């Protein structure tokens, strides 16, 4: 497999390097996930909102069957789209487990803070109790959203907060808060959807290490300790994105990359929502 693991606050080891399936064309999702698994990816990230849980699951099952890989050796993440309360969320958990066909989901996240997050969280806790979910967390939550959840005295503390993270978007207040609570950060859109390719400083650092801009941004997130979820539907780039474990960015260059921060969000940013 590619990369190492991060230990979550519930004791589980989660592969740090993941394949992100957001915005992967549905006609290409199965093949792209299968290609990622062939390249050594062992963490696949999906969501109800992506409408590809079934395609991801089929690719994982095919890979398991053809290689003899055990279910416990592949980590599957998905996310709840509609936070409509306890009963609705219980049904949504069942729907996701059925859709992926994997028997259980390793990590299930509240996709955003919008909706009834407290009651929906209680349903996720029930999913863990019933063995349908192994770990639970949140996505796009700001410190105030998480604190509200913690103030409700949950049985389970969120394991992960998945937010947009890359050199141009440090979200340091969110990172600092989560780290103070033992919540693992996961970086989506680590490549900024390509919107910052061509940046002179990024290009200079990429040239120095004889790596692509994408590889530098992925490596940056890994060295920050984040779970990282690069996305591509091109087999060559899927492989290239994983070729980031044969070098290390120096402390000086990590600081240069960090200083590129301009609070640039390539996607939505519910972290700042007052609701």
From Swiss-Prot:
Active site location: 50, 111
One matching Pfam family: Aldo_ket_red
Family: Belongs to the aldo/keto reductase family.
GO cellular component: cytosol; nucleus
Gene3D superfamilies: NADP-dependent oxidoreductase domain
Localisation per UniProt entry: Cytoplasm; Nucleus
This enzyme's EC code(s): 1.-.-.-
Name assigned to this protein: Uncharacterized oxidoreductase C2F3.05c
Any Gene Ontology biological process: D-xylose catabolic process
Source organism of the structure: Schizosaccharomyces pombe (strain 972 / ATCC 24843)
InterPro entries cross-referenced by the UniProt entry: AKR, Aldo/ket_reductase_CS, NADP_OxRdtase_dom, NADP_OxRdtase_dom_sf
EC main group: oxidoreductase
Highest taxon of source: Eukaryota
